[in-house]
């Protein structure tokens, strides 16, 4: 799955783009997401917009699908938070420690804090 998210030169998971529309501001606020998909590495690697896809309408359809499946609001929020966590995690950067086989965060402490707050 990570390979699909990270390395395909196409749109990855549509929910990422749907959540960046700002159509449901409560999702963006809860998940600490901007409405600019270019702020997220995974989205910016592929097509941002596709003529045949209206991400605003698709977000409504996704949310309604969760309702049809019987998810309550807490469960839906959990899905949105997990999806947002993947988006934020994609922006994490690491640098190798000199002469060691370890890595350390490379200026992403703010993003790490967001991940902890979301989850």
Over which residues does each language-model region extend?
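N-terminal switch/interaction subdomains of large nucleotide-dependent motors and GTPases
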Residues: 1-119
């Amino acid at each position: 799955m990570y390979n699909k998210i990270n390395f395909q030169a196409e749109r990855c998971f549509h929910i990422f783009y749907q959540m960046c529309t700002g159509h449901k501001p409560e999702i963006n606020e809860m998940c600490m997401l901007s409405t600019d998909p270019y702020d997220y590495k995974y989205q910016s690697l592929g097509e941002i917009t596709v003529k045949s896809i209206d991400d605003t309408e698709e977000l409504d359809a996704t949310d309604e699908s969760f309702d049809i499946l019987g998810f309550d609001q807490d469960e839906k929020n959990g899905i949105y938070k997990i999806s947002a966590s993947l988006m934020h995690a994609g922006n994490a950067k690491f640098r190798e420690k000199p002469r060691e086989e370890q890595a350390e965060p490379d200026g992403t402490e703010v993003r790490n804090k967001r991940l902890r707050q979301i989850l």
